């Protein structure tokens, strides 16, 4: 077993090499890409679920349950089987794991919009798209940002695991 000072020296030597910065940049690229894609999908599904009751049932009763109950290691194994060892594998695993966190917050954000304020916006502007952009989205934005922040932290944890299984570069 190496002494603590030897471990610190080795850590310092790794930290100052160009290769470690390349691995950090690769992991950051994967996490950022997965987070952007998951946020777009989550916001789109949340908007879809608020427009139609059938979509609400499908998204909340089926999609969220499947995504939440499937283990992280299962997504990693499926990613390697489907995409072999590549960047797509890692990004896929991250997306599948962080979508539920982002989606739940987005759905709750749109649910918290006061119906009276929304009706007032519709009666004054008579344009549902404008009402959505001026009332619904700004009022749901704190929830959306919270979901993205939670997903960002989880994405880094998952990136390490996914890179161990499905990538030859990155921090994992």
Question: Could you tell me what each predicted segment is?
Answer:
Residues 28, 32, 36-44, 48, ...:
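Generic alpha-helical transmembrane segments of integral inner-membrane proteins
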Residues 44-79, 104-111, 119:
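Cytoplasmic-entry segments and transmembrane alpha-helices of multi-pass inner-membrane transporters
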Residues 81, 110, 157-172:
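Glycine-rich helix-loop "coupling/hinge" segments at transmembrane-helix boundaries
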């Amino acid at each position: 077993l190496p002494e603590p000072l030897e471990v610190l020296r080795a850590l310092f030597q790794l930290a100052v090499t160009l290769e470690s910065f390349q691995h950090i940049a690769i992991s950051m690229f994967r996490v950022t890409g997965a987070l952007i894609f998951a946020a777009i999908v989550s916001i789109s599904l949340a908007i879809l679920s608020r427009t139609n009751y059938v979509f609400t049932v499908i998204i909340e009763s089926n999609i969220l349950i499947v995504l939440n109950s499937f283990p992280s290691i299962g997504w990693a194994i499926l990613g390697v089987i489907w995409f072999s060892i590549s960047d797509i594998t890692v990004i896929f695993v991250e997306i599948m794991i962080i979508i539920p966190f982002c989606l739940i917050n987005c759905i709750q954000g749109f649910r918290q919009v006061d119906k009276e304020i929304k009706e007032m916006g519709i009666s004054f502007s008579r344009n549902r798209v404008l009402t959505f952009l001026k009332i619904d989205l700004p009022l749901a934005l704190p929830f959306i940002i919270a979901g993205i922040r939670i997903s960002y932290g989880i994405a880094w944890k998952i990136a390490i695991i996914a890179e161990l299984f499905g990538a030859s570069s990155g921090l994992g």
